[in-house]
């Protein structure tokens, strides 16, 4: 246990008082988050500190460092919750930024999919083909990629060949799990609850911690404002996705639909390139034939 303490302490590169001041100011510019996480790991209880003393053996130097830092940490009321609030504050902007980006991407992709006239025409053709073959119309999404194997249809789609330009957010949306968004949203709500608990508990910390309470209060206001916006985006995502997925059989998930559409776009463009190569090859053959006929006619 003492050796573990030594390893953790070796990773803390700035004076502990400076670090604690940064924590109480929620000033992420002065401290590396990994150092805070290492401090959280050594916020032991009294019983754990007693075990540390017993396990230190003859290594008094290591034990002395651990006891010194432990003593300084314990001078701050509820030091571990305060360190956790600081860690939340450091990571919070990227958490919110990721959620906003993911939800804006899904919203944009869903609107592009449902608003693309060219994609609608291609889907209608796919469904018509299935009806003519006596297939289950509800499985149109699964058979969409097979359209690319039909050269004649691909020629008929010549006016639609750039339909992928309508779906600029599709590929990015296909990599996003709606479940991940839900889980990350819940994590933010849990963080808000933990920060609020620490804010309420800090009311009895005394005059030396008034500044700390003020910055935590400001942090809570930021969380509350972001939460309102994220809830609006989340509701919009849910409404758009549910409306779009309702067009398909039960059990089809949004990620499955976007993955199939992404594959279709990729396959469609590969088929288009193959058709263009074939057309170019046929053109060269025709030109050679014309050249041969012309040469034979001049003999």
Swiss-Prot record:
Pfam families: FH2 (PF02181). Residues 1-295 form the FH2 domain. One of its GO terms (molecular function) is actin binding. Gene3D superfamilies: Formin, FH2 domain (1.20.58.2220). Disulfide bonds: none annotated. InterPro entries: FH2_Formin, FH2_Formin_sf, Formin_homology_domain. PROSITE patterns: FH2. It comes from the Eukaryota. Belongs to the formin-like family. Class-II subfamily. This is Formin-like protein 12. It comes from Arabidopsis thaliana (Mouse-ear cress).
């Amino acid at each position: 246990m003492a050796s573990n303490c030594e390893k953790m302490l070796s990773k803390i590169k700035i004076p502990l008082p400076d670090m604690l001041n940064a924590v109480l100011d929620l000033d992420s510019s002065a401290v590396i988050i990994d150092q805070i996480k290492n401090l959280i790991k050594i916020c032991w209880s009294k019983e754990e500190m007693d075990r540390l003393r017993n396990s230190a053996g003859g290594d008094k130097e290591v034990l002395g460092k651990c006891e010194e830092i432990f003593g300084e940490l314990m001078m701050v009321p509820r030091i571990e919750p305060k360190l956790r609030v600081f860690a939340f504050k450091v990571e919070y902007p990227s958490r919110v930024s990721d959620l906003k980006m993911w939800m804006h991407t899904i919203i944009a992709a869903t609107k592009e999919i449902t608003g693309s006239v060219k994609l609608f025409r291609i889907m209608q053709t796919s469904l018509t083909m299935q009806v003519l073959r006596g297939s289950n119309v509800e499985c149109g999404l699964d058979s969409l990629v097979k359209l690319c194997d039909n050269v004649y249809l691909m020629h008929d789609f010549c006016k639609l060949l750039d339909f992928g330009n309508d779906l600029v957010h599709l590929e990015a949306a296909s990599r996003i799990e709606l479940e991940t968004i839900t889980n990350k949203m819940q994590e933010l709500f849990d963080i808000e609850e933990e920060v609020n608990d620490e804010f309420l508990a800090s009311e009895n910390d005394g005059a030396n911690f008034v500044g700390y309470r003020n910055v935590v209060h400001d942090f809570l206001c930021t969380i509350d404002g972001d939460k309102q916006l994220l809830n609006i985006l989340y509701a919009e995502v849910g409404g758009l996705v549910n409306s779009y997925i309702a067009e398909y059989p039960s059990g089809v998930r949004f990620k499955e639909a976007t993955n199939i559409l992404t594959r279709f776009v990729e396959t469609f463009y590969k088929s288009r390139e193959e058709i263009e190569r074939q057309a170019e090859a046929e053109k060269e053959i025709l030109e050679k034939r014309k050249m041969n006929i012309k040469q034979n006619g001049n003999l």
